[in-house]
């Protein structure tokens, strides 16, 4: 057994997967980013922006916490919807711990009720995380926590405001204590298992949603076609935004190309900040009819293609 200079044996490491499940827009992606301390997943006012399982990686004391940000769980209508919901529940069943998020303002509505009922069948310790507590009076929060715990037993209950970070440190510390003993699965300086090409595409997709949240429906996706690291340390990135109809392509381009220029500028700025080097971003918009029914697109997003 190795012994440190202090004469004490080094603390045994812990490592585990923690799945975050909940209704769309409950704040899962914001919480992942707050726990990690950096942006690893897309955040938008628009529901259903997370499509695949994105892992954020946190080191807390002697523990490595691998966060699985699942797509929001809802009643699926399209093929893409069904794939996203299936992915979310797979992430919950495969994890070591499950955090069930509730929106403090919405409470236990029909959507949350269905999630709680199904989450009860997951055979792992479950933690109740009530988010957006800054928007609700304390008495209502206590009643909500009690109502949720009556529906299923939670190992712990946390009340947080992910967007401001209130309560996040306590949650992180508890997750570190609850993940099982084991060696780290990722390098200590790694914050996500998503390739940078993928994260760059997600950042551009987020900017599209922020800019066009009223006009553009969900039938759009972004792919990073080219990633070139140049001699001057800058990075040249080419991305294609795919939409399903010509009318959508015109919306993304905007009058005189103004909209696509604005999206590109916002995306380039954020990617550059993350990489710490200048970024030259070139965006193209193409029509790919019925891409939502193409199995190859699902594989690229890390989703299983549902037969029907």
UniProtKB/Swiss-Prot annotation:
A Gene Ontology molecular-function term? GTP binding
Subcellular location(s) per record: Cytoplasm; Cell inner membrane
* Region (G3) residue spans: 69-72
Record-linked InterPro entries: G_ERA_dom (IPR030388), GTP-bd (IPR006073), GTPase_Era-like (IPR005662), KH_dom-like_a/b (IPR015946), KH_dom_type_2 (IPR004044), KH_sf_prok-type (IPR009019), P-loop_NTPase (IPR027417), Small_GTP-bd (IPR005225)
**Cellular component aspect of the GO annotation:** cytosol; plasma membrane
Gene3D superfamilies in the record, alphabetically? 3.30.300.20, P-loop containing nucleotide triphosphate hydrolases
Residue segments, region G2:
48-52
How is this protein positioned relative to the membrane?
Peripheral membrane protein
Query: Which stretches does the entry tag as region G4?
Result: 131-134
Q: Region annotation G5: residue ranges?
A: 160-162
Record's keyword annotation contains Cell membrane? yes
**What NCBIfam families would the database entry show?**
era (TIGR00436), PRK00089.1 (NF000908), small_GTP (TIGR00231)
Subunit structure as annotated in this protein's UniProt entry: Monomer.
The protein's name is GTPase Era
Instruction: Please name the source species.
Output: Bradyrhizobium diazoefficiens (strain JCM 10833 / BCRC 13528 / IAM 13628 / NBRC 14792 / USDA 110)
């Amino acid at each position: 057994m190795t012994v440190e200079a202090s004469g004490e044996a080094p603390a045994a490491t812990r490592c585990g997967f923690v799945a975050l499940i909940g209704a769309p827009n409950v704040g899962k992606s914001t919480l992942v980013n707050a726990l990690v301390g950096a942006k690893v997943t897309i955040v938008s006012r628009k529901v259903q922006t997370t499509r695949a399982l994105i892992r954020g990686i946190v080191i807390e004391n002697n523990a490595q916490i691998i966060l699985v940000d699942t797509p929001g769980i809802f009643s699926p209508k399209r093929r893409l919807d069904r794939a996203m919901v299936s992915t979310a529940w797979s992430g919950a069943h495969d994890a070591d711990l499950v955090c069930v998020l509730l929106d403090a303002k919405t409470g236990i509505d029909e959507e949350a009720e269905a999630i709680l009922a199904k989450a009860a069948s997951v055979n792992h310790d479950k933690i109740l995380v009530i988010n957006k507590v800054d928007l609700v009076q304390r008495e209502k929060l206590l009643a909500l926590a009690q109502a949720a715990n009556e529906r299923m037993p939670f190992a712990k209950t946390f009340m947080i405001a992910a967007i401001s970070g209130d309560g996040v440190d306590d949650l992180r510390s508890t997750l570190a204590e609850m993940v099982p003993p084991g060696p780290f699965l990722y390098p200590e300086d790694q914050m996500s298992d998503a390739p940078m090409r993928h994260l760059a595409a997600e950042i551009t997709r987020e900017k599209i949603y922020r800019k066009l949240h009223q006009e553009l429906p969900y039938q759009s996706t972004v792919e990073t076609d080219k990633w070139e690291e140049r001699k001057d340390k800058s990075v040249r990135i080419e991305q294609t935004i795919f939409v399903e109809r010509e009318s959508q392509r015109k919306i993304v381009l905007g009058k005189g190309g103004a909209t696509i220029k604005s999206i590109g500028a916002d995306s380039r700025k954020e990617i550059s900040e993350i990489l710490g080097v200048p970024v030259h971003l070139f965006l193209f918009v193409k029509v790919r009819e019925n891409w939502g029914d193409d199995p190859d697109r699902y594989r690229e997003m890390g989703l299983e293609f549902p037969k029907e």
